[in-house]
UniProtKB/Swiss-Prot annotation:
InterPro entries: ATPase_NBD, Type_III_PanK. This is Type III pantothenate kinase. It is found in: Cytoplasm. It catalyses: (R)-pantothenate + ATP = (R)-4'-phosphopantothenate + ADP + H(+). Catalyzes the phosphorylation of pantothenate (Pan), the first step in CoA biosynthesis. It comes from Rhodospirillum centenum (strain ATCC 51521 / SW). The gene is coaX. Its cofactor is NH4(+); K(+). Its EC number is 2.7.1.33. CDD domains: ASKHA_NBD_PanK-III (cd24015). It is an enzyme of class 2 (transferase).
Length: 261
């Protein structure tokens, strides 16, 4: 079985695949101080609840945008699961698509993994919007190559920043308000976040589509993923599909392609 690890700025997600079938998935908040042993304690316990043991794992793949966790997660695989993980971005790890940007080394591993899964599942050209700590719009052109994209602050990060710098503004939950005009501070902040963010998403997607396919032929497919994408997709008609497993599936595909070489 394959252990796939996606280390993001907000969460680290683990999944076990048996062939194409996902046997289990677990999530922990990202903490740069967490050690390999600490990861192992809770992960092995949760795997056991699914009838899985470390001996079931024969290979691993890691995508990390958190340098402080790349080492501990590599050690986790080596010391507790008996395998050295394939790491997205390492020399020799092939993605199966070309990275056509000014400096390919700058592209975040998570963005590339999403692109790999998207182009294997949906017809290009396409855009993957991933709403997390940051919000990324990742573009795959009509040839199936990664063509760049847009990076913006995520909604939680934006709200936290507003709360920190404006003394009288409270922390609020992110939700879709019933109306645009807020009758109080909390309602006004929630409206500003939801509708402002929805407007940003639609504005950026409209402009990307115009650049990527000026005539609309071929049409551009928009795929949403990430923890908050479903909420914001409800406010927009431009997201064609929501694919919660996109990143994990991309990791499985990358491992599959490289292991077969």
């Amino acid at each position: 079985m394959l252990l796939a690890i996606d280390a993001g700025n907000t969460n680290v997600v683990f999944a076990v695949f048996e062939g194409d079938v996902k046997r289990g998935q677990w999530r922990v908040s990202t903490d740069g101080r967490r050690t390999a042993d600490e990861h192992a304690v809770w992960l092995v316990a949760l795997m056991a609840m699914k009838g899985l043991t470390p001996k079931d794992i024969h290979a691993a793949i890691l995508s990390s945008v958190v340098p402080a966790q790349t080492g501990p997660l590599t050690t986790l695989c080596e010391e507790h699961f008996g395998c050295t993980p394939m790491r997205v971005g390492d020399p020799g790890v092939r993605l199966g698509l070309e990275v056509r940007i000014d400096n390919p080394k700058e592209a975040g591993a998570d963005r590339l993994v999403n692109a790999v899964a998207a182009v294997a599942t949906y017809p290009p050209p396409l855009v993957v919007i991933d709403i997390g700590t940051g919000t990324t719009f990742d573009v795959v052109d009509a040839n199936g190559d990664f063509a760049g994209g847009v990076i913006a602050p995520g909604p939680v990060l934006s709200l936290d920043a507003l709360h920190r710098v404006a003394a009288q503004l409270p922390k609020v939950d992110i939700l879709r308000p019933d109306r645009v005009i807020g009758k109080g501070t909390v309602a006004a902040m929630q409206s500003g976040m939801f509708w402002g963010y929805t407007g940003m998403i639609e504005g950026i997607l409209t402009r990307i589509k115009a650049e990527l396919s000026p005539t609309g032929d071929p049409p551009v497919t928009v795929i949403g993923t990430g923890g908050l994408v479903r909420l914001f997709a409800e406010g927009s008609s431009l997201v064609d599909a929501i694919d919660a497993d996109l990143t994990l599936r991309g990791l499985r595909l990358i491992h599959q392609r490289n292991a077969a070489r």
